Regions:
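Conserved beta-strand positions in the central sheet of alpha/beta enzyme cores
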Residues: 13, 46, 100-102, 132, ...
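C-terminal alpha-helical cap/extension of soluble enzyme domains
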Residues: 4-5, 10-24, 170-237
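Glycine-enriched alpha-helix->loop->beta-strand junction motifs that scaffold or abut catalytic
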Residues: 41, 60-64, 94-99, 125-128, ...
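Short beta-strand elements of ligand-binding domains
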Residues: 65-68, 133, 189-192
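Conserved N-terminal beta1-alpha1 strand-loop-helix module at the mouth
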Residues: 1-90, 139-152, 195, 232
């Protein structure tokens, strides 16, 4: 097991991301957010886009999981947008990420053989770079492990793809996590819809080797929205 992966076992990763339509968009804000996460005891960080990764790496000294989102005009349920190509992977690796994360789902637009070719190409070009497989189903987890080019399996996309959206859970997908732990030997990162301490307790009891938390920490408008919506329900507004 890679030493960087070992550092994250039994740990908490905080995802620091902001989009152009939000006030916190910008590398300086993400670096500040990452510093706050490290101050709070985070074991690792997840950052998006080369410029943000460079800023976060300069501000913090804990492992950074790098992704490179490339959005298209189609339905997000059908699009591969988390580090979808070798070129997008190269950009964040050269920006200094410690672990590369990419979409390892199987789609109509990209069958497994194409994904396998991408993973082999990345491993050949960057043999020392640990790879996290962001996926949505048990089948994808098993196939990703079988390639021998993946170091961590992550439930990042559970509920966010066409073939998993119908079974999307309100909180983290505990059943998927349990199934992956039974079927695979690689470390499993629980990620997606972990909002409360109760959610964290559930994924830990289900066997998660590490946990990544994003919106519940780093997206203030969504955090606010949850409280506001609950308040509205209380007053039937």
């Amino acid at each position: 097991m890679h030493k960087i992966v070992e550092k994250l076992l039994n740990g908490v990763v905080i995802s620091c991301q902001a989009y152009e339509d939000t006030p916190l968009y910008g590398s300086q804000y993400m670096a500040a957010m990452a510093k706050c996460a490290q101050m709070g005891g985070a074991d690792g960080l997840r950052a998006c886009w080369p410029q943000d990764i460079r800023a976060v790496k300069a501000a913090c000294d804990i492992p950074v999981i790098g992704i490179n989102k490339k959005f298209g005009d189609g339905d997000p349920l059908d699009e591969i947008f988390i580090t979808p190509s070798f070129e997008s992977a190269k950009e964040v690796i050269e920006a200094g990420c410690d672990i590369l994360a990419l979409d390892c789902t199987i789609r109509d637009c990209r069958p497994f053989e194409e994904l396998k070719e991408l993973l082999f190409r990345i491993r050949e070009a960057y043999p020392e770079m640990p790879v996290m497989a962001d996926l949505a189903t048990l089948e994808e987890a098993v196939k990703a492990e079988e390639t021998g080019c993946v170091d961590i399996i992550s439930t990042t996309l559970a509920g966010y793809t066409r073939n998993s959206c119908e079974s999307k859970t309100e909180g983290p997908d505990i059943e998927l996590l349990k199934e992956i732990k039974k079927a695979c030997s690689l470390p499993v990162n629980a990620e997606g819809r972990i909002w409360e301490l109760g959610d964290l307790e559930q994924v830990l009891e289900a066997g998660a080797d590490m946990v990544s938390i994003g919106s519940a920490v780093s997206r203030p408008h969504l955090i606010t929205e949850r409280f506001v919506n609950y308040n509205k329900k209380h007053y039937n507004r």
